[in-house]
Design a protein with these regions (language model features):
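A glycine- and small-aliphatic-rich helix-loop capping segment at beta-alpha/alpha-beta transitions
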Residues: 47-53, 153-165, 245-251, 298-301
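Phosphate/pyrophosphate-binding betaalpha-module
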Residues: 138, 149-213
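Internal helix-turn-beta structural module
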Residues: 261-314, 323
Length: 332
């Protein structure tokens, strides 16, 4: 079949994941894992921690970038509280709280190993529930002020990269705050010395409850044969952590859009994948997922409906010279 090479690759991968020669992606869901991060006490975030709760509430009202897109495209949105810094119940949000916020990684571990495992297993369970609900593609998003800092720390720990190479400005920082952010990450890594061969230990030491649950969600997608859509920086770091735990999970990942965070490229290279879209978004939340769902649907439509040359009554002898070249092939 003649088609966009990437759409062709997507449809082939979807066929392998679903076991269907002509896969269909209809029911899609964005799963948002939300938690606060104690490292914000170091003054490395432009927004106060209260924004986490406010944005989670706005998600349930379709008032954030991600939820507005999801609502427009007819996608489901499920938000789970993994560790928002509040005791109040949040209508429309699943209560899966492991603890209120995490520890300040510059001074103490983010959480205990048992708490990291609890968050990871919760994410796996939420992905399994999505599969049971008939979801055919699950996007993994997040909400948590300070989570670009924890993501950079986790990525640095997993890849031996210096903080300078994986740390961006997140939601926006002054030059002074940006330098402090890198120093805080360096200090956290020096304090905890997380072992890259122990991804759960890395999450417990310098990660976040949102990251741990997202990691579990990616593992749960693989376990239940559900295509998993990766959003931006935080999401791709969680995806890489999942792959470090279970390399086969990488076969279920579909990278949506490229993040402007400097560490995104490192994580993508570690996964051996390229993002599909360059949208210039700095929203997080899972905002790239609803758009990527449409790309996957398009790939399925091409596989299902596009004719081969013989089916279209087109003679393809003229392609012989092109096919003879190693640098360019056209697949009938």
């Amino acid at each position: 079949r003649q088609m966009c090479i990437r759409d062709r690759d997507y449809s082939i991968r979807l066929a392998g994941i679903t076991g269907q020669v002509r896969p269909h992606i209809e029911k899609c869901r964005v799963l948002v894992l939300a938690a606060d991060n104690g490292v914000t006490a170091e003054g490395i975030s432009s927004a106060p921690t209260s924004v986490t709760l406010s944005q989670v509430i706005n998600m349930t009202r379709h008032k954030t970038g991600m939820s507005a897109l999801a609502y427009y495209f007819g996608n489901e949105v499920v938000v789970a509280d993994m560790g928002i810094d509040t005791d109040r119940p949040i209508p429309g949000v699943l209560d899966r709280k492991v603890r209120r916020s995490t520890g300040n990684i510059a001074r103490e571990p983010a959480m205990t190993r048992q708490q990291a495992l609890q968050a990871l297993e919760t994410g796996m369970g939420l992905a399994a529930q999505a599969a049971a609900d008939g979801v055919q593609a699950l996007g993994i998003g997040e909400m948590g002020i300070g989570n670009t800092t924890t993501s950079a720390a986790v990525l640095a720990a997993l890849t031996h990269a210096p903080a300078q190479a994986v740390t961006g400005r997140g939601g926006g920082l002054t030059d002074a705050a940006f330098e402090k952010k890198k120093q805080v990450i360096d200090r956290a890594l020096a304090l905890h010395r997380p072992d890259p061969a122990d991804p759960v230990g890395v999450l417990a030491a310098v990660g976040g409850l949102d990251l741990a649950a997202m990691t579990g969600a990616f593992l749960g997608c693989a376990q239940n044969h559900v295509p998993a859509v990766v959003d931006g920086y935080i999401s791709i770091v969680a995806a890489l952590t999942a792959v470090r735990l279970c390399p086969a999970a990488g076969e279920y990942l579909f990278l949506s859009h490229a993040s402007y965070e400097i560490g995104y490229r490192i994580a993508a290279q570690e996964l051996g994948q390229e993002p599909c879209l360059l949208l210039g978004m700095r929203l997080g939340e899972g905002s790239g997922c609803p758009v990527m769902f449409q790309i996957l649907r398009a790939a399925c439509a091409i596989m299902d409906g596009m004719a081969t040359f013989p089916e279209a009554a087109i003679e393809d002898d003229y392609l012989a010279p092109i096919r003879a070249q190693d640098s360019f092939t056209v697949t009938p």
